């Protein structure tokens, strides 16, 4: 519909609605009707599309946190009149600035129809219902609810910041979150770990909008809670992250005690240290020690030291620590290893034949013991428990039983208990007894059974006697703990007494018991025979001891024939090396002969039938320990001295083996290594004519064969060049030459280095020495000095 049509319609409608003017009415009567018609026209005009006033945006429900800004929208179309806001039905005023409400104002463009209500710094009082009204258009928006959220004003735990508690006493931790809207939610934390089980309640304030939340958490404080932190977190929609407050616990508790032993396992009598380690809040006031429930008067510290016995295994040692809150007592037993100790003693038992008997014996020991029951004089184990059960006993079961306890590697103990079985007397004397002819003799009759005999009588030949004297015979009765002894004493025993049988009969309430005893003669050795045997045994013992001493002496003497080295640090050797090609006959002897005795035999083989080499070459060895203690005045330094007298040394001299002629062969090599001292002793002889060796040097001291004043030093090294000399006293032998060539006697000229005829089988014996087996003797003309350290 166009505007022209719309105007035409309006005019038509208006004319149709107006009453027709009667011709007889005046103009004043038509005036009210014109006003009504006008209003109807305006209303219809506004109702038509494109021309009516309406809300394009109305306020909606909102939530705002106290202190924040809130805007309620209101937008009108086709309206240019007055707009106002109401709060819970109360008009706030007109215009943009609402002077009565400083935090309120209408914002937006009026040309655009925007009449928004802005609230700054929202408060609890702003929590209401709001409405936008177009007064001239008689329009009202929907009601919008503005909800103001208020966080808890304060969160507090009662009793903080430090709460003093008693260990073991339950306590409720209480947290309060005040004046929150909506009511706050409370969560508990213990050292950062969320706790469950809290009980929560709320209280509504007088304004009817805010609430206070109360939460209680039940705890059981212990000494481990000292310093523990509990946190209360309160939150609502106004503060999602919440507010927190914390408290710390201070728990008073009696001492917490740990009792230790060092060492933990001990033997009886050893020392033990008890240590009482304790923690307490408040501080410890003192210590008390007790053993087996009895106070130890002189122990007041945290350590107690004592020597333990077996009682510490069964009687605990206790340590009591106390403070203002209370005291704590801790006890412990000591693992004491001890020998068996009896707890229940076995009791002697008397019973009748056919009864059952139980013997009891209780021991204690540590480590666990082994218990055995045996009968005296028997090794058969009858039981391994504390009790020995004997069923249907007879008189044969009577006797002494042994209860033995064994603690491995610690000790053994035992107790004996007798068992008496009532019955007729049992005589336990020997059936054959002895006496000496002419002396006083005794025949004994012992009854160890129970009950004791009422009567004991002796009968022999035609004689009968219970007690008293009859001619040479006397009967006596003696009571002891083990039984009754009746003794028949015979004065001046005769031959007829050995031909008689003696009847001993005893009676008690259970009947009689009889034994037949034979008396036999005991032969006595004369005193002279006994004395002679004793003396002979003593003499034999003396001779045996002397033989043993002599044997040990000879054995020790024989063991001193070895040669020992007194100095082990330095040795000097002078070794000649000869080509084996010059003396082919020496090859077989190089490794087979190495002792001093064989060397002497090689040199003096012609005298071996007349001289006892074993005696002449006796070596007196000084013990190794003494040799080590001897000191070298040169501190191990060795000298090789030429053209000087040979120093006095412990050497075997060979003067007895040489003929005292002007020219003699000296069997000793020029280089001598003392195998007793370890020092090198070298004498260098010049290559002089044969006359230079006309006499033998006088020995430095007497040297008898087998002498004990020196230690023989037998050095048989290959020696240096000597002049040739005929062997004294043996003209028939070929000339014996060693070493470098010398001027030969007439008729024996040879070229230099020409081989000479050997003397006998052992011509190469002088090549052997006490040097190492690996020494090289293959080169004749190469001389070397060896130093061994």
From Swiss-Prot:
Region (Disordered) location: 687-713
SUPFAM superfamilies from the UniProt entry: Immunoglobulin
Topological category with respect to the lipid bilayer: Single-pass type I membrane protein
InterPro entries in UniProt: CD80_C2-set (IPR013162), Cell_adhesion_signaling (IPR051275), Ig-like_dom (IPR007110), Ig-like_dom_sf (IPR036179), Ig-like_fold (IPR013783), Ig_I-set (IPR013098), Ig_sub (IPR003599), Ig_sub2 (IPR003598)
Signal peptide region: 1-47
Transmembrane segments: 532-552
Gene Ontology biological-process entries: cell-cell adhesion; cell-cell junction maintenance; glomerular filtration; positive regulation of actin filament polymerization; renal protein absorption
Post-translational modification comment from the UniProt entry: Phosphorylation probably regulates the interaction with NPHS2. Phosphorylated at Tyr-637 and Tyr-638 by FYN, leading to GRB2 binding.
Residue intervals annotated with topology Cytoplasmic: 553-789
Extracellular-facing ranges: 48-531
Keywords assigned: Cell membrane, Disulfide bond, Glycoprotein, Immunoglobulin domain, Membrane, Phosphoprotein, Repeat, Signal, Transmembrane, Transmembrane helix
Disulfide bond residue pairs: 74-132, 175-232, 276-319, 361-403, 445-504
One protein family per Pfam: Ig_3
Glycan-bearing residues: 5, 78, 172, 329, 503
Motif window: Cell attachment site: 437-439
Keyword Repeat: yes
Record-level Gene Ontology MF annotations: cell adhesion molecule binding; myosin binding
Localization of this protein: Cell membrane
Modified residues (Phosphoserine): 606
Subunit composition and interactions: Interacts with TJP1/ZO-1 and with NPHS2/podocin (via the C-terminus). Interacts with NPHS1/nephrin (via the Ig-like domains); this interaction is dependent on KIRREL1 glycosylation. Homodimer (via the Ig-like domains). Interacts when tyrosine-phosphorylated with GRB2.
Main function: Required for proper function of the glomerular filtration barrier. It is involved in the maintenance of a stable podocyte architecture with interdigitating foot processes connected by specialized cell-cell junctions, known as the slit diaphragm. It is a signaling protein that needs the presence of TEC kinases to fully trans-activate the transcription factor AP-1.
Protein name according to UniProt: Kin of IRRE-like protein 1
């Amino acid at each position: 519909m166009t505007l022209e049509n719309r105007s035409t319609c309006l005019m038509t409608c208006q004319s149709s609605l107006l009453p027709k003017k009667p011709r007889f009415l005046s103009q004043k009567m038509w005036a009210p009707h014109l006003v009504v018609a006008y209003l109807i026209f305006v209303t219809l005009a506004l109702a038509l599309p494109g021309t009516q006033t309406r809300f394009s945006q109305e306020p909606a429900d909102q939530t705002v946190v106290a202190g924040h800004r809130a805007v309620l929208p209101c937008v009108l179309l086709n309206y240019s009149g007055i707009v106002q806001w109401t709060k819970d039905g109360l008009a706030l005023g007109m215009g943009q600035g609402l002077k009565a409400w400083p935090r309120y104002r209408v914002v937006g463009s009026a040309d655009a129809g925007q009449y928004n209500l802005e609230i700054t710094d929202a408060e609890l009082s702003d929590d209401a219902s709001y409405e936008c009204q177009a007064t001239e258009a008689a329009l009202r928006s929907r009601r919008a609810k503005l909800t103001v959220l208020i966080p808890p004003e304060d969160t507090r735990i009662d009793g903080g910041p430090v709460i003093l508690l008693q260990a073991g006493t339950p306590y409720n931790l209480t947290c309060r979150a005040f004046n929150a809207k909506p009511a706050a939610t409370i969560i508990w934390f213990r050292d950062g770990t969320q706790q469950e089980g809290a009980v929560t309640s709320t209280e509504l304030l007088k304004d009817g909008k805010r609430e206070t939340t109360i939460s209680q958490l039940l705890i059981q404080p212990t000494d481990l809670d000292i310093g523990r932190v509990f946190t209360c977190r309160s939150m609502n929609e106004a503060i999602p992250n919440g507010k927190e407050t914390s408290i710390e616990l201070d728990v008073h508790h009696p001492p917490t005690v740990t009792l230790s032993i060092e060492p933990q396992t001990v033997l009886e009598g050893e020392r033990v240290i008890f240590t009482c380690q304790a923690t307490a809040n408040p501080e410890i006031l003192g210590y008390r020690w007790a053993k087996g429930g009895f106070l130890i008067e002189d122990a007041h510290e945290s350590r107690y030291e004592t020597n333990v016995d077996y009682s510490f295994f069964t009687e605990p040692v206790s340590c009591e620590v106390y403070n203002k809150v209370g005291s704590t007592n801790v006890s412990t037993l000591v693992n004491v290893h001890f020998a068996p100790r009896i707890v229940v003693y076995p009791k002697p038992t008397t019973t009748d034949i056919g009864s059952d008997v139980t013997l009891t014996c209780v021991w204690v020991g540590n480590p666990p013991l082994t218990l055995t029951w045996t009968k005296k004089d028997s090794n058969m184990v009858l039981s391994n428990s504390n009790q020995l059960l004997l069923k249907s006993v007879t008189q044969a079961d009577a006797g002494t039983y042994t209860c033995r306890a064994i603690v491995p590697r610690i000790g053994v103990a035992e107790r004996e208990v007798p068992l008496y079985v009532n019955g007729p007397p049992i005589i336990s004397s020997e059936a054959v007894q002895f006496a000496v002819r002419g002396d006083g003799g005794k025949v004994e009759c012992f009854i160890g059974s129970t009950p004791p005999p009422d009567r004991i009588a002796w009968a022999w030949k035609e004689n009968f006697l219970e007690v008293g004297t009859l001619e040479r015979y006397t009967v006596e009765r003696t009571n002891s703990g083990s039984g009754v002894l009746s003794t028949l004493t015979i004065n001046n025993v005769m031959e007829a007494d050995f031909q008689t049988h003696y009847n001993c009969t005893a009676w008690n309430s259970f009947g009689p018991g009889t034994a037949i005893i034979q008396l036999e003669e005991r032969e006595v050795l004369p005193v002279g025979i006994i004395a002679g045997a004793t003396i002979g045994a003593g003499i034999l013992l003396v001779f045996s001891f002397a033989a043993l001493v002599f044997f040990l002496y000879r054995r020790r003497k024989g063991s001193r024939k070895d040669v020992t080295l007194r100095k082990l640090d330095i040795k000097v050797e002078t070794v000649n090396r000869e080509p084996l090609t010059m003396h082919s006959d020496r090859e077989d002897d190089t490794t087979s002969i190495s002792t001093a005795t064989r060397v002497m035999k090689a040199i003096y083989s012609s005298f071996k039938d007349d001289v006892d080499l074993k005696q002449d070459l006796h070596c007196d060895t000084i013990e190794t320990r003494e040799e080590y203690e001897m000191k070298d005045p040169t501190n191990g330094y060795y000298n090789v001295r030429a053209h000087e007298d040979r120093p006095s040394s412990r050497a075997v001299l060979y003067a007895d083996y040489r003929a005292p002629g002007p020219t003699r062969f000296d069997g000793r090599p020029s280089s001598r290594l003392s195998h007793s001292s370890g020092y090198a002793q070298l004498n260098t002889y010049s290559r002089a004519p044969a006359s230079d060796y006309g006499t033998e040097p006088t020995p430095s001291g007497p040297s008898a064969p087998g002498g004990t004043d020196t230690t023989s030093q037998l050095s048989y090294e290959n020696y240096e060049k000597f002049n040739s000399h005929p062997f004294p006293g043996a003209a028939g032998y070929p000339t014996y030459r060693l070493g470098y060539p010398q001027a030969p006697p007439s008729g024996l000229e040879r070229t230099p280095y020409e081989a000479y005829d050997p003397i006998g089988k052992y011509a190469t014996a002088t090549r052997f020495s006490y040097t190492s087996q690996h020494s090289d003797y293959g080169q004749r003309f190469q001389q070397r000095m060896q130093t061994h350290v």
